[in-house]
Curated annotation (Swiss-Prot):
One of its GO terms (biological process) is heterochromatin formation. InterPro entries: Histone-fold (IPR009072), Histone_H2A (IPR002119), Histone_H2A/H2B/H3 (IPR007125), Histone_H2A_C (IPR032454), Histone_H2A_CS (IPR032458). High expression in meristematic tissues, in cells of the root pericycle and in shoot cortical cells undergoing endoduplication of their DNA. It holds the Pfam family Histone_H2A_C. GO terms for cellular component: nucleosome; nucleus. The nucleosome is a histone octamer containing two molecules each of H2A, H2B, H3 and H4 assembled in one H3-H4 heterotetramer and two H2A-H2B heterodimers. The octamer wraps approximately 147 bp of DNA. A motif (SPKK motif) lies at residues 142-145. It comes from Solanum lycopersicum. It is found in: Nucleus; Chromosome. This is Histone H2A.1. Residues 1-24 are annotated as: Disordered. Core component of nucleosome. Nucleosomes wrap and compact DNA into chromatin, limiting DNA accessibility to the cellular machineries which require DNA as a template. Histones thereby play a central role in transcription regulation, DNA repair, DNA replication and chromosomal stability. DNA accessibility is regulated via a complex set of post-translational modifications of histones, also called histone code, and nucleosome remodeling.
């Protein structure tokens, strides 16, 4: 009977079943990779030192923004009776939302197109029936003479 493989030795070394690793993302309850973002912050040399909470906070902010854009783009796709989100839906979602539009004002979305916008001056006049009634009412009165 080999006891060293089933139980851990002195100081917790050797043998025993390995625990499943728990990532920083799981601990923080996020989907975005906290460890990778932390590595990018260090590698990018944005500062000499990076706090332990910075990658978690940044991952949470990025995850929130991605979820917000995806939700609005999904709504835009559903409005157009489509089941797949395309860049056009992302553009419509971002530009129609006041806060996201301000945040991404200088961003160009490839294959997004433009927002539909027709100047009111170029739109056709009101229907002919409504147009006939209003001029007669005004024409019935004679101008006052001094």
């Amino acid at each position: 009977m080999d006891a060293t493989k089933t139980t851990k030795g002195a100081g917790g070394r050797k043998g025993g079943p390995r625990k499943k690793s728990v990532t920083k993302s799981i601990k923080a309850g996020l989907q975005f990779p906290v460890g990778r973002i932390g590595r990018y912050l260090k590698k990018g040399r944005y500062a000499q030192r990076v706090g332990s909470g910075a990658p978690i906070y940044l991952a949470a902010v990025l995850e929130y923004l991605a979820a917000e854009v995806l939700e609005l783009a999904g709504n835009a796709a559903r409005d157009n009776k489509k089941s797949r989100i395309i860049p056009r839906h992302v553009l419509l979602a971002v530009r129609n939302d006041e806060e996201l539009g301000k945040l991404l004002a200088g961003v160009t979305i490839a294959s997004g197109g433009v927002l539909p916008n027709i100047n009111p001056v170029l739109l056709p006049k009101k229907s002919a029936v409504a147009e006939e009634k209003s001029p007669k009412a005004k024409a019935g009165k004679s101008p006052k003479k001094a």
